[in-house]
A protein has these predicted regions:
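Terminal, non-globular segments
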Residues: 1-406
Length: 406
């Protein structure tokens, strides 16, 4: 736990030095600089002197700010990547993945998606033998890089977005179900295509990602619905649909198991998550809803991206309450509520009243710290199990039995 607190504090401190300006977000290399040209009028009129400012960009010039950003981002990436890649027996399904990678390597039967299988097989072949550590490291590298890219390019306040990424536990959860969190990172990246209404690119990207984790396919209808301007009668239909999930639970469950048969006859069906099992996540969504409503006029109403995030949050609450009977409904909702790391900084950035902005920032930071402490308290429980942390640097044991309890 102390290690996680230290890593979180260190990386957040580094993140505070990253300033992602609009110029950088649009891909311009070099901040604008100004040259002053003095023009003197020597005509018949009295002599005058004017100064003309010409703003331009040096495309191949790296400014001090960009250098600082690059250095801090690189340091953050290395710290987070090493913590992920060096872990051993950390993660709720670590042993299951070890067994799966073994079966992939020897040509056995696995239920994982084809592109994940192909990449895992290739990595093992390149390393000269069965090497699940390399597979974990590879997906950790790509996933962390994607999240940092998203936070830098798709937010106006990297420091706040990264703070939420760490304190809401999203980074540490990537130690579990590496396929899922890789798919989640790409789903967040796809926001840029949804908001620009580049739907062909969006669908193609998600379709390819589904070859790593097919659950990501649910974002196609959900994101399209969230990006659509809702009319009152459509809201009524969606409300009836939410109620229908509760009334026709058995039918919905049957359809869900046909689409995802790997959950049949598993502990997930026996235990079920339920509303109480997701009370912390529901509370988080409600808190974000309250923040959005407090700033709706100035931060959400006329902001296309924030409208999109606002609807994703509403859908998260509805699914948590009305579809809690579904196995691992949290995985579906996480594709929606992970937008909080972009939504909250965007809301705060739109507030004009400095006093109100400062108060809300303090409340958000306080809530983030408390949420992180609650996350750490549950980090040893089944379904999370990212604590205690162990590294293969200090243990000779490499290969695990998937049925072993850590």
């Amino acid at each position: 736990m102390i290690l996680y607190i230290f890593i979180t504090t260190l990386t957040i401190a580094l993140g505070c030095f990253v300033k992602n300006s609009r110029c950088m977000q649009t891909g311009q290399f070099g901040n604008p600089y100004v040259r002053n040209y003095h023009i003197t009028n020597n005509g018949n009129t009295p002599k005058t002197k004017q100064t003309v400012q010409i703003t331009s960009y040096k495309k191949n010039h790296i400014t001090r700010r960009q250098g600082q950003n690059a250095l801090c981002l690189f340091a953050i990436f290395i710290i987070l990547f090493l913590l992920s890649a060096l872990r051993l027996e950390v993660g709720n399904d670590y042993g299951t993945y070890v067994d799966t990678i073994h079966e992939i390597y020897v040509g056995g039967y696995v239920v994982t998606e084809p592109l994940f299988n192909a990449v895992s097989k290739l990595l093992c072949e390149l390393s000269g033998g069965e090497n699940y550590l390399l597979v974990f490291g590879f997906f950790g590298f790509i996933t962390i890089w994607l999240f940092l890219k998203i936070l830098y390019e798709q937010t106006e306040n990297f420091a706040m977005a990264f703070f939420l990424f760490m304190t809401l536990g999203l980074y540490f959860r990537t130690f579990n179900t590496v396929r899922y969190y890789f798919a989640l990172a790409i789903a967040l990246y796809s926001y840029r295509y949804v908001l620009k209404k580049e739907y062909v690119k969006f669908v193609l990207l998600i379709a390819v990602t589904a070859l790593f984790h097919k659950s990501v396919l649910v974002v196609i209808p959900l994101y399209l619905i969230a990006n659509y301007t809702w009319k009152k009668w459509q809201i009524a239909i969606m409300g009836m649909g939410a109620v229908g999930l509760v009334i026709f639970q058995d039918l919905v469950m049957k359809i869900a198991l046909e689409l995802y048969p790997s959950y049949k006859n598993t502990i997930y069906l026996e235990n079920g998550e339920g509303v109480l099992g997701n009370v912390l996540s529901i509370g988080r969504c409600v808190a974000v809803l309250i923040l959005a409503l407090l700033c709706y006029k100035e931060a959400v109403e006329d902001n296309k991206a924030n409208q999109f995030y606002f609807k994703l949050n509403l859908m998260s609450i509805a699914l948590y309450i009305c579809a809690s009977f579904l196995p691992l409904v949290g995985r579906i909702v996480y594709y929606l509520m992970s937008s909080h790391i972009l939504f909250i900084p965007s809301i705060l950035g739109q507030i004009k009243n400095e006093k109100k902005k400062k108060v809300l920032q303090i409340l958000v930071v306080t809530a983030g710290v408390l949420y992180f402490l609650l996350f750490l308290k549950t980090a040893t429980q089944d379904g999370v199990r990212v604590l205690p942390y162990k590294s293969w640097l200090f243990y000779e044991k490499e290969f695990l039995n998937a049925g072993e309890i850590f």
